[in-house]
């Protein structure tokens, strides 16, 4: 108190005030504080003080030639005294203004190209629509989101190589551009940025924005695609939200969305094939999304979704260590358990064998519309705290948690038999049986669970079996919270294994994913998905199956022809004919197949009846298991366009039309390709001409291996023998001539010899 009084008295004296405001500071410690080191101690003050001077800026001497000494108002722009300690000129801030208005202009053509992401953002905002603001409590949960719209999906290393190649092509250092996308982007950017005067560092920084996905762990309530995240600060606060529709889409969001749709279709299709894992890999490798190979996208894209992760696991890529159950992503946050097989009885006295997790564990559960914290002991739910968008979403989370807890009262709540099957008609495992049962109807489950009185805890309410909120009572252990549960933030990826039924396990043997977890939701992909695999032909309906089957036969006609004559059974078993069977009326499949196979056998036996067009037309029908019958058909029926359409055994029809003039085939009016050989002339002339230089020895001799096509003969050495398939579908044994002189006579003798060899 004394000191303060003393200070007050001092301040009353005018001399004190003068010392404090006018005199220079000359205390050594203070001078030292502000002058030692290169670091500016008070940047704001320094700036104000500098700008108050007449010439605070220094510039290169050349500036004198470019800028007049005075501007239009007659104010001086630079001083004739040079800067102390350097050979630069002292310049006024007014010179900057003059330069901005009258200085030289550079070409602006590169700006939209280099700053593409900014220009596009402005366009999106310009065309976006902002709706009303609503005030309400926001349940935000932290999710890993993409904060950088419009990027490609290169890894940091790949992008670095591209940037070095584009911006600093002459720098030393090994750069390996391997992936298709790397090469494409490099080529495109080099062309775009010719003669570019923007500083290379800036170009490099902007390129990085364009090439690499940047993610952040942010609190979000609502859309998570990058075009929503870029306006997150405008669309949601602590207690308000503003509705917003983006004014444009970006390719990276479209890739993510289309990838999920493709992966789901592929997993669903693979599940019903004989070898799901092999089929899945075949489909992933032959599918393109927006013109890019799906396997390349899977390697680069960090999207975490059940089907996508199954595809990644099949390719041997690492995936997140969290597991999926009932459409929720579970992450164990503490505790541990051991697994033990146990037999339990349902309320219907059906025995189920379940793998019980023994031990206390805590999990976070994150779904699309609800999140929860689950604490459980051995076959007992200790506590479940749920938050969700609506009653329905909250109920979904509660059902999944109750089933996951494996409590006895849940198993006893089963009414009726459990016999759910997957798409391949295989019974689901017991945990998924229970889940499906209660997802259909959870009334008994909630009624039998039991209720308890609850304490009043801030931000939490109880929930009754009829799903109404209550502050007094709640289903045992279950509470509803206003706060969401954050998604698991770690981006750590683990090595996993996958079995042929597409069950994905971590290295401890825990099942992380299985096809039962793949959503049935169908959507329309934003980018074109091209499934080249025959297994996916049926995705686009019966017409696509029909056209694709015939296109495939024509594309592979050379090898199909050989198999047709030598090993028809192997040909009939080709998976490319599988989808076609669903178009043939069930009752007729076996009879059609038997009839066509008999017809084909006659063609093989009787000389001169080999008819390429007819073989192509009827081949898919021969793939079904044949029934022996005496039935003859003049046409075969296929179910397309909602009704049965006829394919004529002899001649054209709207379904199958071969034009002799153009040699092209149209199926249902769609072009299915051209036949390279002429199917109507028995092709003897053509074949015998090709056989010049070969001696025909006689009938086929199996010791010389499978029949070669005419095209493959050229690889034979002189004197070497081989079986060869000739036009009528017959096989003969030939030897390549040792001398070239006698070639001329070959084509005449060949024709005679072929006839003899066959007869």
Curated annotation (Swiss-Prot):
Gene Ontology CC, one term: host cell nucleus
Principal place of residence: virion
GO terms of molecular function: RNA binding; RNA-directed RNA polymerase activity
Annotated Pfam families: Flu_PB2_1st (PF20947), Flu_PB2_2nd (PF20948), Flu_PB2_3rd (PF20949), Flu_PB2_4th (PF20950), Flu_PB2_5th (PF00604), Flu_PB2_6th (PF20951), Flu_PB2_7th (PF20952)
Domain of life, per lineage: Viruses
Annotated site residue numbers, Mammalian adaptation: 627
InterPro entries, per the entry: Flu_PB2_2nd, Flu_PB2_6th, Flu_PB2_C, Flu_PB2_CAP-bd, Flu_PB2_middle, Flu_PB2_N, INV_PB2, PB2_helical
Motif (Nuclear localization signal): 736-739
Residues in coiled coil: none
Entry keywords, A to Z: Cap snatching, Eukaryotic host gene expression shutoff by virus, Eukaryotic host transcription shutoff by virus, Host gene expression shutoff by virus, Host mitochondrion, Host nucleus, Host-virus interaction, Inhibition of host innate immune response by virus, Inhibition of host MAVS by virus, Inhibition of host RLR pathway by virus, Inhibition of host RNA polymerase II by virus, mRNA capping, mRNA processing, Viral immunoevasion, Viral transcription, Virion
Subcellular location: Virion; Host nucleus; Host mitochondrion
SUPFAM superfamilies xrefs: PB2 C-terminal domain-like (SSF160453)
GO biological process, one term: viral RNA genome replication
Subunit structure: Influenza RNA polymerase is composed of three subunits: PB1, PB2 and PA. Interacts (via N-terminus) with PB1 (via C-terminus). Interacts with nucleoprotein NP (via N-terminus). Interacts (via N-terminus) with host MAVS (via N-terminus); this interaction inhibits host innate immune response.
Function: Plays an essential role in transcription initiation and cap-stealing mechanism, in which cellular capped pre-mRNAs are used to generate primers for viral transcription. Recognizes and binds the 7-methylguanosine-containing cap of the target pre-RNA which is subsequently cleaved after 10-13 nucleotides by the viral protein PA. Plays a role in the initiation of the viral genome replication and modulates the activity of the ribonucleoprotein (RNP) complex.
Record-stated family: Belongs to the influenza viruses PB2 family.
Name of the protein this chain belongs to: Polymerase basic protein 2
Natural source organism: Influenza A virus (strain A/Swine/Wisconsin/1/1961 H1N1)
Primary gene name: PB2
């Amino acid at each position: 108190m004394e000191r303060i009084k003393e200070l007050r008295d001092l301040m009353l004296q005018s001399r004190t005030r003068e010392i404090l405001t006018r005199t220079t500071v000359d205390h050594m410690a203070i001078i030292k504080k502000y002058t030692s080191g290169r670091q500016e101690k008070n940047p704001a003050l320094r700036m104000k003080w500098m700008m108050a001077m007449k010439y605070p800026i220094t510039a290169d001497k050349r500036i004198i030639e470019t800028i007049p000494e005075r501007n239009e108002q007659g104010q001086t722009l630079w001083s004739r005294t040079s800067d102390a300690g350097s050979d630069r000129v002292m310049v006024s801030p007014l010179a900057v203004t003059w330069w901005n208005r009258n200085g030289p202009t550079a070409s602006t053509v590169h700006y939209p190209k280099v700053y593409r992401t900014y220009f596009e953002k402005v366009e999106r905002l310009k065309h976006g629509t902002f709706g009303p603001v609503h005030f309400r409590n926001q349940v935000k949960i932290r999710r890993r989101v993409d904060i950088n719209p419009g990027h490609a999906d290169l890894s940091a290393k790949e992008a670095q190589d591209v940037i070095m190649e584009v911006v600093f092509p002459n720098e030393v250092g090994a750069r390996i551009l391997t992936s298709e996308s790397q090469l494409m982007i490099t080529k495109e950017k080099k062309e775009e940025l010719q003669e570019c005067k923007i500083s290379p560092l800036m170009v490099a920084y902007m390129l990085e924005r364009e090439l690499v996905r940047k993610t952040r762990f942010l609190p979000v309530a609502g859309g998570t695609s990058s075009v929503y995240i870029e306006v997150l600060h405008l669309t949601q606060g602590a207690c308000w939200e503003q509705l917003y529709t983006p004014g444009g889409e970006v390719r990276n969001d479209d890739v993510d969305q289309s990838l999920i749709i493709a992966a789901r279709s592929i997993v669903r299709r693979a599940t019903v094939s004989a070898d799901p894992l092999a089929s899945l890999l075949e489909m992933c490798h032959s599918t393109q999304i927006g013109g890019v190979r799906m396997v390349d996208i899977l390697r680069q894209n960090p999207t975490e979704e059940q089907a996508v992760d199954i595809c990644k696991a099949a390719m041997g890529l690492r995936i997140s260590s969290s597991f999926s159950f009932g459409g929720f992503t579970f992450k164990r946050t503490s505790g541990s358990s051991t697994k033990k097989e146990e037999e339990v009885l349902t309320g219907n006295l059906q025995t189920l064998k379940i793998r019980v997790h023994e031990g206390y564990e805590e999990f976070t559960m994150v779904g699309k519309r609800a999140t929860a914290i689950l604490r459980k002991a051995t076959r007992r739910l200790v506590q479940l705290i749920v938050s969700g968008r609506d009653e329905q979403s909250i109920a979904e989370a509660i059902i999944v948690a109750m089933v996951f807890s494996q409590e006895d009262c849940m198993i006893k709540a089963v009414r009726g038999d459990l016999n759910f099957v997957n798409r391949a008609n295989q019974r689901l495992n017991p945990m998924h049986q229970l889940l499906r049962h209660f997802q259909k109807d959870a009334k008994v489950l909630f009624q039998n669970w039991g209720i308890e009185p609850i304490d009043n805890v801030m931000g939490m309410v109880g929930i009754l079996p009829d799903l109404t909120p209550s502050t007094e009572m709640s289903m045992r252990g279950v509470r509803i919270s206003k706060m969401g549960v954050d998604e698991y933030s770690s981006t750590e990826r683990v090595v996993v294994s996958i079995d042929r039924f597409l069950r994905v396990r971590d290295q401890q043997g825990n099942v992380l994913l299985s096809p039962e977890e793949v959503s049935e939701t169908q959507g329309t992909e934003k980018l074109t998905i091209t499934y080249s695999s025959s297994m996916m032909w049926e995705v686009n309906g019966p017409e696509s199956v029909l056209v694709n089957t015939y296109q495939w036969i024509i594309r592979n006609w050379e090898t199909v022809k050989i198999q047709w004559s030598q090993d028809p059974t192997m040909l009939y078993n080709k998976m490319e004919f599988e989808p076609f069977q669903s178009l043939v009326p069930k009752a007729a499949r076996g009879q059609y197949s038997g009839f066509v196979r008999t017809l084909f056998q006659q063609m093989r036996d009787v000389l001169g009846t080999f008819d390429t067009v007819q073989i192509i037309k009827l081949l898919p029908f021969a793939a079904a298991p044949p029934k022996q019958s005496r039935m003859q058909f003049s046409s075969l029926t296929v179910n397309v366009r909602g009704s049965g359409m006829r394919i004529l055994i002899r001649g054209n029809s709207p379904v199958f039309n071969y034009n002799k003039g153009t040699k092209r085939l149209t199926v249902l009016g769609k072009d299915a390709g051209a036949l390279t050989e002429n199917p109507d002339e028995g092709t003897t002339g053509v074949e015998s001409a090709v056989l010049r230089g070969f001696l025909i020895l006689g009938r086929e001799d199996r010791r010389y291996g499978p029949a070669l096509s005419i095209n493959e003969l050229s690889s034979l050495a002189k004197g070497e023998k081989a079986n060869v398939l000739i036009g009528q579908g017959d096989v003969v044994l030939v030897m390549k001539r040792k001398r070239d002189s006698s070639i001329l006579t070959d084509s005449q003798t060949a024709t005679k010899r072929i006839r003899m060899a066959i007869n």
